[in-house]
From Swiss-Prot:
<keyword id="KW-0963">Cytoplasm</keyword>
<keyword id="KW-0547">Nucleotide-binding</keyword>
<keyword id="KW-0808">Transferase</keyword>
<dbReference type="GO" id="GO:0051287">
    <property type="term" value="F:NAD binding"/>
</dbReference>
<dbReference type="GO" id="GO:0005524">
    <property type="term" value="F:ATP binding"/>
</dbReference>
<dbReference type="InterPro" id="IPR016064">
    <property type="entry name" value="NAD/diacylglycerol_kinase_sf"/>
</dbReference>
<protein>
    <recommendedName>
        <fullName>NAD kinase</fullName>
        <ecNumber>2.7.1.23</ecNumber>
    </recommendedName>
</protein>
<dbReference type="GO" id="GO:0019674">
    <property type="term" value="P:NAD metabolic process"/>
</dbReference>
<dbReference type="GO" id="GO:0005737">
    <property type="term" value="C:cytoplasm"/>
</dbReference>
<comment type="similarity">
    <text>Belongs to the NAD kinase family.</text>
</comment>
<dbReference type="Pfam" id="PF01513">
    <property type="entry name" value="NAD_kinase"/>
</dbReference>
<feature type="binding site">
    <location>
        <begin position="70"/>
        <end position="71"/>
    </location>
    <ligand>
        <name>NAD(+)</name>
    </ligand>
</feature>
<feature type="binding site">
    <location>
        <begin position="139"/>
        <end position="140"/>
    </location>
    <ligand>
        <name>NAD(+)</name>
    </ligand>
</feature>
<keyword id="KW-0418">Kinase</keyword>
<keyword id="KW-0520">NAD</keyword>
<dbReference type="InterPro" id="IPR002504">
    <property type="entry name" value="NADK"/>
</dbReference>
<keyword id="KW-0521">NADP</keyword>
Length: 284
């Protein structure tokens, strides 16, 4: 085994004991740590999204094993993004679009990792800035209303050139990797996960002429709302956006890195997860 492969961080999001997955996760954590040891890996556990607190541990790891669903993987990817570390998901729970393996396939995956028979996927990530506060997004950045009533006006610019005003509940700015998440629920297009582009999808726009827009990732975008709004990152973190305050979004210089099995096929995953070609009554 190469030296750089010897340390794997295990990331588990904190789970309340009343969560139906709590007991399963607790048992899985112990089993995973024992399996890593048996396969010759050093390991450590992180159960916090505070990357600064765990900076030394993060720097030490070759990769991160994310135990849970897509939400767990997204949290880990954001936390480790600035450290340029790859992650791989071991699915526990319902959603597993990003997961590399099920729990019962982890041993084979680790053996393939030791033999360099795993592929590294690099995906576009977003870098956002509000004032002096910067952040990364893996799936999407959403500009949303703070108030339940009324319409939010969002002006959109490419560089300094205005190109649209969205009037509705908000706007999704998604990555190709995130195009099958909130963007898809809002009737945005599916864009191949390895594409270099942004997807702008309006939320319940007041105008019937507004449609989702796909832009090349070479553009720098900025947005401002006519009243106070919320900026939501991957459905997990929020920032306040003051009225007429600019939100700057561009392609992150660092990619999102996911380890996947060599046999993984993007179109097969789409077909299985979205039940393409199946009867509507078929259960997942």
């Amino acid at each position: 085994m190469k030296d750089s492969y010897q340390t794997i961080g295990v990331f588990v999001r904190p789970t309340h004991y009343q969560n139906p997955l709590f007991e399963e996760l607790e048992q899985a954590k112990e089993w995973v740590l024992k399996l890593l040891e048996d396969e010759g890996f050093e390991s450590f556990m992180i159960d916090s999204l505070d990357g600064a607190k765990d900076a030394r541990l993060i720097e030490k790891a070759y990769a991160f094993l994310c135990l849970g669903g897509d939400g767990t993987i997204l949290g880990a990817l954001r936390m480790t993004h600035s450290y340029n570390k790859p992650c791989f998901g071991v699915r526990i729970g319902n959603l597993g679009f990003l997961s590399a393996v099920e729990l019962n396939g982890l041993k084979d995956f680790l053996q393939d990792l030791k033999q360099n028979r795993i592929k590294l996927e690099e995906h576009l990530a977003l870098e956002g800035r509000i004032g002096k506060t910067s952040f990364y997004a893996i799936n999407e950045i959403v500009i949303a209303k703070k108030k339940a009533l009324g319409v939010l006006d969002i002006k959109a610019y490419v560089g300094h050139t205005p190109f649209n005003t969205y009037k509705g509940d908000g706007l999704i700015i998604a990555t190709p990797l995130g195009s099958t998440a909130y963007n898809l629920s809002a009737h945005g297009p599916i864009v191949h996960a390895l594409s270099q582009s942004y997807i702008l999808t309006p939320l319940c726009d007041f105008s019937l002429t507004q449609r989702p827009l796909v832009l090349g990732a070479e553009f720098c975008l900025n947005f401002c709302a006519h009243e106070d709004a919320l900026v939501v990152i991957d459905g997990q973190a929020t920032y306040d956006l003051k009225a007429n305050q600019p939100l700057y979004i561009q392609k992150s210089p660092t990619t999102t890195k996911l380890l996947q099995k060599n046999s993984r096929d993007y179109f097969k995953v789409l077909k299985e997860k979205l039940l393409w070609g199946e009867s509507p009554s078929k259960k997942r």
